[in-house]
Amino acid sequence: MSAVLFKRLVFQVGDSANERTFTLSSVSKNGHFISLRPFTKPTEDEKKFPLEWVFAGTNDRVKVTPTTNADGKPVLQQDFDMGFDTNVYLNVENTHRGVINTFWQNWESGCVEETGKVFPFGNDKEGIPFMELWQPIDPNSKDLVILDAGDGRKIDGPVRSTVLKVVDGQDFEGLMIIVGEWAQGYLADKNKSSVDGLSFVRYHVSNEKLSSGLFEYGSQLSKFPTDFSNVKEGSLLTIDGLKWEVIEN
């Protein structure tokens, strides 16, 4: 598979559809993933933690199975067992825990529909269906350029796919994924379970370095890698005392 970048257009739970976030999901060539979902206009109560949700994981945390829906159309079943989930980290009440079964179907427009069901009150209780509509984005453009199946727009050139993971055995866990010119990452302090232990970044990458910051949150931003000019798969970086390993490049 090739690395992809998606922007969420619509989020629907039950009969209510809305979109309050600037959500981007990055998926590396090898299937590592992160979804960063900051609010565009957080309320006063939300400003302390201005994100709807963040989750991430390595490719061993998702199972992908081609299948068909009830109409016989091809869909992709993706079963996520999140390696990291802000709702679980923060111990948010009525949070789904465990695998989330999702189904992905391509629309003629080029958009991708994701449907599924979560069980925030327990697997033995009634589930809540949801739908998310995703727009593929050109990861090689620093502008938000859509990939439209209607006009046949193609990505210009190969797509960079670099993934760095915090080395086990430290006080933090974290993942950073670069797809094309877009970088997203998270850090979580294992010794905390509050918003004070979380840090997130979304950046453009230019000339092998993080350039313009699109979103930043948290007190540990200095621990994120910023220079990728000499990274090779398997190499180790130490950033402000934190060790990262390049697990894909």
Curated annotation (Swiss-Prot):
It is found in: Cytoplasm; Nucleus. InterPro entries: Hri1, Hri1_N, Hri1_N_sf. Keywords: Cytoplasm, Nucleus. One of its GO terms (cellular component) is fungal biofilm matrix. It comes from the Eukaryota. Pfam families: HRI1. GO terms for biological process: protein targeting to membrane. Belongs to the HRI1 family. This is Protein HRI1.
